[in-house]
């Protein structure tokens, strides 16, 4: 990719620019056998850490007051216990109720909200391990959800299944897959204002 300001500079000095695909990008998009194995291992151990965190959060919500910042600390601490853990993929996001709807929300002392069992609770987090990197999002309900929440979750799930079962050619771009992910929501005049899914990559 060429930054826009550099492209504009070449235009100003009237130099012709030939655009071509970056060969490195193609290599980066194709995982070799070592990367695939590492990715699977990293997701397995990360899943264990996240499952322990969610179990702890569900128990604490029912027995005592728990805040978003406390939940973030527990999630991060459980990842930190693994010997192959290197760092977080990005700062852990934990949003309760309306905070869960804020894209890339991060709890601060001012915004820190008590996690209520009547609200949906969103976790978006990941870890960098020596053999792979994770990025996982989970929406948790502590009690029975409303009809509207159930409907929205079902529409998102249908989009996920549509992408997972798509058959596409080698030359096809992600644009059509993105459309598949959103089509059931759009049928109900709904959408989401962020990317469809995370990037899967190897520990850098």
Predicted features, each with a name:
Residues 1-204:
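Active-site neighborhoods and metal-handling regions in enzymes and metal-associated proteins
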């Amino acid at each position: 990719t060429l930054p826009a300001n550099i492209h504009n500079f070449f235009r100003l000095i009237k130099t012709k620019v030939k655009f071509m695909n970056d060969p490195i990008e193609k290599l980066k998009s194709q995982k070799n056998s070592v990367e695939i194995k590492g990715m699977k291992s990293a997701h397995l151990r990360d899943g264990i850490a996240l499952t322990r965190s969610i179990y702890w959060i569900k128990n604490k919500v029912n027995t005592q007051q728990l805040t978003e910042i406390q939940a973030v600390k527990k999630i991060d601490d459980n990842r930190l216990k693994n010997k192959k853990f290197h760092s977080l993929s990005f700062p852990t996001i934990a949003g309760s109720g309306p905070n869960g709807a804020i894209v890339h929300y991060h709890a601060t002392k001012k915004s820190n909200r008590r996690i209520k069992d009547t609200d949906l609770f969103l976790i978006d987090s990941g870890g960098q391990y020596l053999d792979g990197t994770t990025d996982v999002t989970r929406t948790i309900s502590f009690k029975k959800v409303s009809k509207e929440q159930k409907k929205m979750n079902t529409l998102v799930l249908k989009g996920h299944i549509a992408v997972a079962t798509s058959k596409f050619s080698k030359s096809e771009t992600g644009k059509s897959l993105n459309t598949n992910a959103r089509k059931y929501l759009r049928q109900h005049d709904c959408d989401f204002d962020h990317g469809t899914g995370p990037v899967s990559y190897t520990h850098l």
